Amino acid sequence: MAFELPNLPYEFDALEPYIDKETMEIHHDKHHNTYVTKLNAAIEGTDLENKSIEEIVANLDSVPSDIQTAVRNNGGGHLNHSLFWQLLTPNSEEKGTVIDKIKEEWGSLDKFKDEFAKKAAGQFGSGWAWLVVDKDGKLEIVSTPNQDNPITEGKTPILGLDVWEHAYYLKYQNKRPDYIDAFWNVVNWNKVDELYEAATK
């Protein structure tokens, strides 16, 4: 079965002024849509059509070598963006079990944000910054290049930030740190909490 572009759970302008409407439209309707189209083309006629995107990206080594790069890039792009849209909200509230765990691990939410921001700002070129739950149930901040996802390494992402230039350049140009600062105003902590609970069951 072909993968489909998911609908956004809010309007394109809902995250203004932090993430602008035009960026959201291009990011979702053009960039994400392209990943879906290219992923479907790559896996057409293979057993991968019957697997979930999580199964595919978590087991890239089992993908046939002739389509592995296309699946890694476009499958990762589809998975990452499908999660990213859910991790954003115009009604951000800093509460929940995961907030308490973050404070335990990093000392304060602000210290965590600083460490996450360093990882996001320090990602050379295109990529993502993530808060993940590792195999032992511990929280960790990691970054991945391009459209790689931490599940390939056996880690469960519960918060992610797209630091590809297409995610912020229209509004922030080369000022990636300003985009990272703005991100905290639209984080869907309810979703992060839900993902944390599922990952630590």
From Swiss-Prot:
GO terms for molecular function: metal ion binding; superoxide dismutase activity. InterPro entries: Mn/Fe_SOD (IPR001189), Mn/Fe_SOD_BS (IPR019833), Mn/Fe_SOD_C (IPR019832), Mn/Fe_SOD_N (IPR019831), Mn/Fe_SOD_N_sf (IPR036324), SOD_C_sf (IPR036314). Fe(3+) binds at H27, H81, D162, H166. It catalyses: 2 superoxide + 2 H(+) = H2O2 + O2. Keywords: Iron, Manganese, Metal-binding, Oxidoreductase, Stress response. GO terms for cellular component: cytoplasm. Its EC number is 1.15.1.1. Transmembrane segments: none annotated. Its cofactor is Mn(2+); Fe(3+). Binds 1 Mn(2+) or Fe(3+) ion per subunit. Pfam families: Sod_Fe_C, Sod_Fe_N. Mn(2+) binds at H27, H81, D162, H166. SOD activity increases in mid-exponential growth-phase. Belongs to the iron/manganese superoxide dismutase family. Homodimer. This is Superoxide dismutase [Mn/Fe]. The lineage of its organism: Bacteria, Bacillati, Bacillota, Bacilli, Bacillales.
